[in-house]
């Protein structure tokens, strides 16, 4: 079963959301009469201001699979709070054997991330970040690990509320 790793494609629709296709795999189902070929697509959608969604779709043809994945990504969007185009703090995300470390970076650093993580940060609107991935490099697992880490991130006001202090006390 051949695996097709598609180049990351970007598209912007009339709704203002940024779309990127991360991968397209050729999949087969073996039945009594032979093999049934299909395609599985993995995509991310973001608004450039901290909202991000991931979707996967399967179909007999590539365009249909990609469209299904884009629709699912639009439905499953989550909000991540950013700070001046970077992350709030260092965070680690895990999914299966994939582990990703994401660190905020100062202005001018750029997006230092590989493969699927780069696509996520570009559609999300992050302009300065440093990342490192450990373990599995499977695109699906890396995307899920990245989203796990981003959802773990908390703002200074959330931390202050948990501790019962003011934001100024937290930021020092």
Curated annotation (Swiss-Prot):
Keywords: Ribonucleoprotein, Ribosomal protein, RNA-binding, rRNA-binding
Subunit organization: Part of the 30S ribosomal subunit. Contacts proteins S4 and S8.
Gene3D superfamilies associated with the record: 3.30.160.20, 3.30.230.10
Domain comment as written in the entry: The N-terminal domain interacts with the head of the 30S subunit; the C-terminal domain interacts with the body and contacts protein S4. The interaction surface between S4 and S5 is involved in control of translational fidelity.
GO terms for MF: rRNA binding; structural constituent of ribosome
InterPro entries, alphabetized: Ribosomal_Su5_D2-typ_SF, Ribosomal_uS5, Ribosomal_uS5_bac-type, Ribosomal_uS5_C, Ribosomal_uS5_N, Ribosomal_uS5_N_CS, Ribsml_uS5_D2-typ_fold_subgr
Keyword Lipid biosynthesis (UniProt): no
PROSITE patterns xref list: RIBOSOMAL_S5, S5_DSRBD
Any one GO cellular component localisation term in the record: small ribosomal subunit
Protein name: Small ribosomal subunit protein uS5
GO terms of biological process kind: translation
Function, in words: With S4 and S12 plays an important role in translational accuracy.
Any one Pfam family match given in the protein's UniProt record, by short name: Ribosomal_S5
Highest rank taxon of the organism: Bacteria
SUPFAM superfamilies: dsRNA-binding domain-like, Ribosomal protein S5 domain 2-like
Similarity comment: Belongs to the universal ribosomal protein uS5 family.
Domain S5 DRBM: 17-80
Gene name of the encoded protein: rpsE
